[in-house]
Amino acid sequence: MMLVLTTLIFSFSASIAYAQSGCSVSDPLDALKAFKDGAGTFLLQKSTDPQARDCLKGTPNGNRDGNTLPVTMTYKDDSKWVSLNWMFTLEGANIVATLEGKRKQRGELVYDVQSHDCHITKLSSGVYQQWQSNGSADDKDIKCCDEKFKELTSGIDYTKPQEKGCETSAK
């Protein structure tokens, strides 16, 4: 009982500290805006999936058609780069990623900063992911995203896929 009470107090305190930190969020949550309408590459910075792909990044590879966006997901498998073409359907906060019309992965946008340089998704499996725009990103927004990820994943281990020998880029 004491552990539950302590956890509740900690969570409440973290929420107050987060609210007072001056973080501006995108409201309402819109996955298409979080993906910058299909402009630019996003890197998976943090994931609660212990088997998250090393160096995972998503890059739009064609024109957006309404709320559908073709995306190439690239990751490092040992020393070899692998690229797979996915089709993302983005509607409100909902995200459905389909690989070659067969495999589907569902998720939900749970946090997005105002600049759309960083966002957090929660997959239907319960995995949390923090994605960051490749290139110039506002340090304050990234800090806000880091704080929110920490709040959402309190007590859950996570990996940092971009710290797995990603220095050499995929061709």
From Swiss-Prot:
User: What are the annotated disulfide bridges?
Assistant: 23-144, 55-166, 118-145
Keyword Cell membrane included in the entry's annotation: no
Q: What does this protein do?
A: Tick salivary platelet aggregation inhibitor that plays an important part in the anti-hemostatic strategy of ticks. Acts by scavenging thromboxane A2 (TXA2), a potent inducer of platelet aggregation and blood vessel constriction. As a consequence, is a specific inhibitor of collagen-induced platelet aggregation. In addition, it also acts as a potent inhibitor of TXA2-mediated vasoconstriction. Has also been found to bind leukotriene B4 (LTB4) (which also derives from arachidonic acid, as TXA2) with affinities in the nanomolar range. It does not interact with complement protein C5.
Q: Modified after translation how?
A: The N-terminus is blocked.
Q: Which GO terms describe its molecular function?
A: toxin activity
The name this protein carries in UniProt is Moubatin
How is expression of this protein distributed across tissues? Answer: Expressed in salivary glands.
Signal peptide range equals 1-15
Q: Which family does it belong to?
A: Belongs to the calycin superfamily. Lipocalin family.
> For this UniProt entry, what's an example GO CC term?
extracellular region
Q: Where in the cell is it found?
A: Secreted
Alphabetical keyword list: Disulfide bond, Hemostasis impairing toxin, Platelet aggregation inhibiting toxin, Secreted, Signal, Toxin
